């Protein structure tokens, strides 16, 4: 009986502290592509943004409510926001009808493509490295084992841009894409460093 109890304890500990990943047949992923980091002047203010397309090739209707979070090497964090004036300026610049963060959310049908723009009013002009994390493109998650102390993580799309120059002297619409891939990202406030997909 004691041997059985000991074995049960080992099995329980293995389950408790191992990495738990959502079953592959239970998660879905939307296709995503972007055009890089750009800038537009709105009432004398330089606004950063990226335009993108999201396509549903999953074979079923999905709910799409994205979150665009930017973190910089200057330790500043900002989120995409709605701005009618910036949206109109960007539409004119690109000659394309685009949806802002408030308009793009909702159901996305099989085969449907939504064209959107993520607008960042408070992107630090002194930042050289811009890290963009996009949630809502998949429902994939995992729970990392206790030894690694990663906790609960969701899969997000990660883009790392490098901006040459400094401050107001940065070349307009010039950024170098360093990373453009899926990663696992912890949901805890203290866990800001991404864990690369293996």
Outline where the language-model segments fall.
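Bacterial N-terminal signal peptides that target proteins for export
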Residues: 1-8
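Bacterial N-terminal signal peptides
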Residues: 8-18
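Low-complexity, acidic Ser/Thr/Pro/Gly-rich terminal tails and inter-domain linkers that flank the onset
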Residues: 23-45
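Short, solvent-exposed loop/turn segments enriched in Ser/Thr/Gly
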Residues: 45-51, 114
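The feature marks short-to-medium sequence segments in extracytoplasmic or secretory-pathway proteins
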Residues: 55-109, 144-174, 180, 186-198
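Short Pro-Gly-centered flexible turn/kink motifs
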Residues: 107-118
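Short, surface-exposed ligand- or partner-binding patches at beta-edge/loop junctions that are enriched
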Residues: 115, 121-147
């Amino acid at each position: 009986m004691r041997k059985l109890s000991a074995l049960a304890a080992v099995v329980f500990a293995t389950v408790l502290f191992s990495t738990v990943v959502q079953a592959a047949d239970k998660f879905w992923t939307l296709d995503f592509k972007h055009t890089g980091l750009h800038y537009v002047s709105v009432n004398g203010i330089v606004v950063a943004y990226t335009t993108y397309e999201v396509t549903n090739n999953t074979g079923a209707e999905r709910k799409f409510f994205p979150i665009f979070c930017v973190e910089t090497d200057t330790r500043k964090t900002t989120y995409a926001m709605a701005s009618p004036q910036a949206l109109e300026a960007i539409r004119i610049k690109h000659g394309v009808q685009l949806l802002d963060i408030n308009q793009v959310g909702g159901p996305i049908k099989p085969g449907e493509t939504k064209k959107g723009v993520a607008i960042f009013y408070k992107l630090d002009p002194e930042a050289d490295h811009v890290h963009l994390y996009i949630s809502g493109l998949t429902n994939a998650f995992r729970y990392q084992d206790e030894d690694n102390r990663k906790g609960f993580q969701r899969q997000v799309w990660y883009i790392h841009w490098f901006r040459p120059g400094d401050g107001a002297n940065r070349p307009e619409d010039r950024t170098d894409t360093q990373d453009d891939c899926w990663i696992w990202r912890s949901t805890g406030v203290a866990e800001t460093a991404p864990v690369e997909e293996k």
